[in-house]
């Protein structure tokens, strides 16, 4: 017999579907952490940016929450049945980015599709699609996957196809994430160690090659290693972020009391938000936040 709380949650999540939640397996830790991080994100965006960005952030969070409840209504088997369709959709959207004048160029890269006032990054769908596809493939083709090269290379081919299109944007970061996540799943699923080592070496060599063949990428690595050498140009953001961290010390200056966010640290609301968190809340809270993220990853 379901409790009143369980009946309420079932109606919210599944509507009229005859499906119940097994609360013994329900990961309340993950849900609690996710909700905390979502609300903390709102606080930091409010502290760093203008009202317009805060409103947009809250709206995007609401849209994401609706999508979460919608996706949660379906069994995992449903997503496994449409994994290839998701892959084809990802490939199609990534190809659209290559069509002239269809996608905006931002900071020298074409990564976003704008539609009806929304901005969407196809690489994010590609990550999710590949995650579902590789996981499903390792279950469906377990023996083939473990016993021969053919079974191993099928998901690798899909991965390389997606990465190739993402590199054309260019977006080396998303490509590296997709590569690492795919290999991690395959390793956990029991991929032959010789296959795993071979593809890892190829991937590492390609990653290094992509850095050295593109001058600005190589320069970024050098700047990252010693940002103070070019503190007024390439290393400006890094040195400013270090200043924010140092100003916050262990316990911070207080919520909303950051100085570096006042046009002294570019992209403070995106790439360097963690520096502002450490400035306002301190390095001690920063360590706690890192621990929370580690718990989320482990869960």
Annotate each language-model stretch with its function.
Residues 2-32, 36-169:
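Membrane-helix boundary/helix-loop-helix interface segments in multi-pass membrane proteins
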Residues 48, 52-55, 153-185, 213-218, ...:
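Helix-loop-helix junctions and helix-breaking kinks within/between transmembrane helices
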Residues 284-299:
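Hydrophobic transmembrane alpha-helices and their immediate junctions
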Residues 186-196:
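Short loop segments and helix-boundary regions at transmembrane helix junctions
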Residues 66, 74, 133, 208, ...:
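Transmembrane alpha-helix boundary/anchor motif
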Residues 104-112, 119, 195-288:
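Hydrophobic, glycine- and aromatic-enriched re-entrant/interface helices and adjoining loop segments
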Residues 65, 175-186, 201-204, 221, ...:
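Hydrophobic transmembrane alpha-helices of multi-pass, membrane-embedded glycosylation machinery
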């Amino acid at each position: 017999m379901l409790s009143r709380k369980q009946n309420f949650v079932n109606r919210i999540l599944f509507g009229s579907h005859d499906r119940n939640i097994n609360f013994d397996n329900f990961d309340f830790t993950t849900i609690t952490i996710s909700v905390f991080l979502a609300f903390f994100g709102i606080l930091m965006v409010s502290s760093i940016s203008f009202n317009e960005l805060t409103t947009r952030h809250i709206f995007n969070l609401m849209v994401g929450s609706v999508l979460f409840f919608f996706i949660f209504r379906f069994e995992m088997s449903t997503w496994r049945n449409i994994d290839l369709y998701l892959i084809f959709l990802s490939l199609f959207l990534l190809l659209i980015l290559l069509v002239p004048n269809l996608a905006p160029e931002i900071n020298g890269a074409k990564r976003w599709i704008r539609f009806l006032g929304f901005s969407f990054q196809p690489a994010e769908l590609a990550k999710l699609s590949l995650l579902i596809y590789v996981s499903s493939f390792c279950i469906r083709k377990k023996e083939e996957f473990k016993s021969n090269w053919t079974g191993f290379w099928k998901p690798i081919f899909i991965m390389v196809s997606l990465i190739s299109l993402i590199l054309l944007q260019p977006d080396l970061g998303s490509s590296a994430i997709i590569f690492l996540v795919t290999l991690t799943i395959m390793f956990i699923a029991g991929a032959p160690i010789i296959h795993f080592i071979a593809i890892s070496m190829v991937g590492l060599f390609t990653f290094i090659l992509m850095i050295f063949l593109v001058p600005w990428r190589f320069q970024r690595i050098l700047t990252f290693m010693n940002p103070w050498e070019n503190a007024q140009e390439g290393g400006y953001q890094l040195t400013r972020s270090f200043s924010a961290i140092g100003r916050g010390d262990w316990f911070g200056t207080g919520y909303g009391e950051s100085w570096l966010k006042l046009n002294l640290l570019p992209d403070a609301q995106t790439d360097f938000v963690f520096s502002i968190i450490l400035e306002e809340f301190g390095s001690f809270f920063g360590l706690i936040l890192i621990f929370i993220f580690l718990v989320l990853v482990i869960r």
